[in-house]
Amino acid sequence: MKVYFFLILYVFLSFFSITYSKELEIDKIIAIVNNQIILNSDVNQVLFSLKEEDQRVKIPLKINFLRNKIIKKLITETLILEEAKKFNIVVTDDQVNNVLSKYALKKNITIEELKRNILMNNTNTSFSYNDYFNKIKNSLKVKIIQDYVLHNRVHISEKEVDLFLNKLINTQNELKKIDINCIFLPFIKEKNKIFIKNTKILADHFAKKIKKDASFNYYYEYFKKNNNIFLSKEIRSKSLKYLKKIFLNKLKIIKKNQILGPILGLKGFYILKINKIENENKENLTTEFHIQHCLIRPSVILDDKQAKNSIYYIYNNIKNKKYSFDYAVQKLSHDVYSSHKKGDLGWISTDFFSNDFRNFLTDLRKNEISKPIKSNFGWHIIKLLDIRQVDKSNRIDKNLVYRFLLEKKIKKERYNWIRQLKKSSYIKIFKN
């Protein structure tokens, strides 16, 4: 729905703010893009709408700046529309009417009221509803070809997602507060390499004994009360990031009651016991589902009813054994990211789903293939692989990581694509 809203908004901004000129002027050519021209009126359609939105753009220097930006935008759109023509991208009148209907519904008005608003708000007598209609059609073409080209040029591997996810998890873990008890073997003031080596041997031997006998607590309390070459020490509510400054190697803290060491620190060797890790309690447990899916997503060329019919057609074919679930995922699913790995979405938290969708998943048996169900993303056929409980305080959604990396790459690739189009085109901008 947001896509439709912004398409409509763009067209309104493009056409409804053309100011009257008391004298009829010849429309000037501002730029030539291959065999297409951009007129002064095209620029003004956008510029004057911006002036109405923000009076500050009346400053001449800012107007010149905006005009240049608008010209560049129009050049880019012209190039993309040429690519759409090469790919034979066709947008039908029904598709445009579908966009208009959804926009009118959002505004709680009828299509006829929308048409009247278009003509009433337009100050350009040469502009008609058909012009507005065609502008939306072009905007849809731009979106379709841009989505097609960029999603074919961009690929996010499983390895990239995992590397970024691990980096986020490690960063998050380093900020957790940790309570530690230490058995500490300090260095003497005049230490040398031989002394450090012998101290390490002693610490290693003692650590093995503690781990074998599970006697850390006994010795910790003993050294706390009695003077010895070993000392007891406690560290409270410190982050892993802080602890790494004290201990001169990486700490691989995994769980409560874990025994680590001996670990070299600034002042000696430490044997550690993890007493508490922040947020490690049952209240933070959440259910996660490991699922595969086949997705049919509504779009500007496939409305919700058509998407529903498609997913039920696929479901019936799977049920009647015309083809397998894996075949449907690989050949028919609209989810490009998961289709190449059998539709595997990995582990997804119950918090991610609506109540109806959550209840739907809960009722499934392991390895059961579901009937079609609708979500905000489209229509799904689900296969439940497994269920588990995890600590949600430290959970990072893998799908969100993928979407973040995808958007980042698409933004970069769009810049490269537009640059290539400009490089291979004839573009002439005329100065005023």
From Swiss-Prot:
Q: Which residues form the signal peptide?
A: 1-21
Give the principal location in a single coarse category. Answer: periplasm
Q: Which Pfam families match?
A: Rotamase, SurA_N
- Give the main EC class: isomerase
Which keywords does this chain's UniProt record carry? Chaperone, Isomerase, Periplasm, Repeat, Rotamase, Signal
A Gene Ontology cellular component where this protein is annotated is: outer membrane-bounded periplasmic space
- Which InterPro entries does the record associate with it? OMP_Chaperone_SurA (IPR050280), PPIase_dom_sf (IPR046357), PPIase_PpiC (IPR000297), PPIase_SurA (IPR023034), SurA_N (IPR015391), Trigger_fact/SurA_dom_sf (IPR027304)
Q: Which residues form the PpiC domain?
A: 175-276, 286-386
Report the catalytic activity.
Answer: [protein]-peptidylproline (omega=180) = [protein]-peptidylproline (omega=0)
- What Enzyme Commission number(s) does the record list for this chain? 5.2.1.8
Subcellular location(s) of the protein = Periplasm
State any single GO MF term.
Answer: peptide binding
An example GO BP is: Gram-negative-bacterium-type cell outer membrane assembly
Q: What does the record say about domains? A: The PPIase activity resides only in the second parvulin domain. The N-terminal region and the C-terminal tail are necessary and sufficient for the chaperone activity of SurA. The PPIase activity is dispensable for SurA to function as a chaperone. The N-terminal region and the C-terminal tail are also required for porin recognition.
Q: What does this protein do?
A: Chaperone involved in the correct folding and assembly of outer membrane proteins. Recognizes specific patterns of aromatic residues and the orientation of their side chains, which are found more frequently in integral outer membrane proteins. May act in both early periplasmic and late outer membrane-associated steps of protein maturation.
Put simply, this protein is called Chaperone SurA
UniProt source species: Buchnera aphidicola subsp. Schizaphis graminum (strain Sg)
Q: Supply the gene name.
A: surA
